[in-house]
Amino acid sequence: MASMNFSPPEYPDYGTATLDPNIFVDESLNTPKLSVPDMIALVIFVMVFLVGVPGNFLVVWVTGFEVRRTINAIWFLNLAVADLLSCLALPILFSSIVQQGYWPFGNAACRILPSLILLNMYASILLLTTISADRFVLVFNPIWCQNYRGPQLAWAACSVAWAVALLLTVPSFIFRGVHTEYFPFWMTCGVDYSGVGVLVERGVAILRLLMGFLGPLVILSICYTFLLIRTWSRKATRSTKTLKVVVAVVVSFFVLWLPYQVTGMMMALFYKHSESFRRVSRLDSLCVAVAYINCCINPIIYVLAAQGFHSRFLKSLPARLRQVLAEESVGRDSKSITLSTVDTPAQKSQGV
């Protein structure tokens, strides 16, 4: 599923049998079984759905009340929306794997639902890059932030991130469709670049790798190297809460999406009928499932980062989320410059 390609299961060799769709097929010969990677993927999908839907809905609910006051809420609200959209598509993807890749949901669902995975990937990493840039400027240029950083700028940055994510998802939407075979009858959902050539397919895979993984990895590594050096050198404590949360979110993103990116690149480079391609494709659904863990892990990180979580979890989970997603002061030298998260000029010198 790095390209979300579902292949029909392996059936007995029918030799030179006709491809006439009206010919009788002995279905007793067709006894496909789920592979071990597919079964593991199904278990992961169930866990992600059960945790990701309520978890991200809770984050959306909590941050929805905070977006007018805090910029952090805007960042994490958009991240939660991206994750929630992907989680809501899980039942259909789950059903397709259970049916050995058979896709009965039509061409429109084939184009839209798997593309949500790529949209989530691009939106998440672009939003994380935006958040990281915000943290970088917040620490290294707090005066600029005090004057210009506000909800309107944050919403504009999120809008740009979503627009770019949609553009990067277009190739998946255009080249995706339902493929039908007649002996035996089988419908699969996947991408088909046969009309444009292998160079386009590899170009899309390289673009996905650069824009959805390597490029952001370089940018984020640079940002957080300087941020951590500054934090450690000045022994800041008040400004590290959100930094630690964002670092945890970023690290989990790259770890969980790495198998997806590797298999996607390998499937684009290997010849489609080679044994290497077949071996890698068997791990496809598992790699997507591992990447999907990213959709439910962020709310867990937010909650675990809240102070007093273990002792007060059952008392007020929304309060714990508000605590960890709140804005905080950023220390500079011996003075504490509190950065505004509201629009009104009078409040730009007040703590949040």
From Swiss-Prot:
Q: Which family does it belong to?
A: Belongs to the G-protein coupled receptor 1 family.
* Mode of membrane association: Multi-pass membrane protein
A Pfam family of the record is 7tm_1
Disulfide bond residue pairs? C110-C189
TM ranges: 39-65, 71-94, 112-133, 155-175, 203-228, 245-267, 285-305
The principal location of this protein is: membrane
**One Gene Ontology MF term:** G protein-coupled receptor activity
* Database matches in PROSITE patterns: G_PROTEIN_RECEP_F1_1, G_PROTEIN_RECEP_F1_2
Q: What does this protein do?
A: Receptor for the chemotactic and inflammatory peptide anaphylatoxin C5a. The ligand interacts with at least two sites on the receptor: a high-affinity site on the extracellular N-terminus, and a second site in the transmembrane region which activates downstream signaling events. Receptor activation stimulates chemotaxis, granule enzyme release, intracellular calcium release and superoxide anion production.
- Kindly state a single biological-process term from the GO annotations of this entry: phospholipase C-activating G protein-coupled receptor signaling pathway
Q: Could you describe the post-translational modifications of this protein?
A: Sulfation plays a critical role in the association of C5aR with C5a, but no significant role in the ability of the receptor to transduce a signal and mobilize calcium in response to a small peptide agonist.
Record keyword Membrane present: yes
Residues in compartment: Cytoplasmic: 66-70, 134-154, 229-244, 306-352
Enumerate the SUPFAM superfamilies for this protein: Family A G protein-coupled receptor-like
Q: How does it assemble?
A: Homodimer. May also form higher-order oligomers. Interacts (when phosphorylated) with ARRB1 and ARRB2; the interaction is associated with internalization of C5aR.
Q: Which InterPro entries match?
A: Anphylx_rcpt_C3a/C5a1-2, Formyl_rcpt-rel, GPCR_Rhodpsn, GPCR_Rhodpsn_7TM
PTM annotation (Sulfotyrosine): residues: Y11, Y14
* Compartments, record wording: Cell membrane; Cytoplasmic vesicle
The protein here is known as C5a anaphylatoxin chemotactic receptor 1
Organism from which the protein derives: Canis lupus familiaris (Dog)
Q: Which residues carry this modification: Phosphoserine?
A: S316, S329, S334, S336, S340
In this entry, the parts of the chain located on the Extracellular side of the membrane are 1-38, 95-111, 176-202, 268-284
What is one term from the GO cellular component aspect held by the record?
A: plasma membrane
What keywords were assigned to this record?
Cell membrane, Chemotaxis, Cytoplasmic vesicle, Disulfide bond, G-protein coupled receptor, Membrane, Phosphoprotein, Receptor, Sulfation, Transducer, Transmembrane, Transmembrane helix
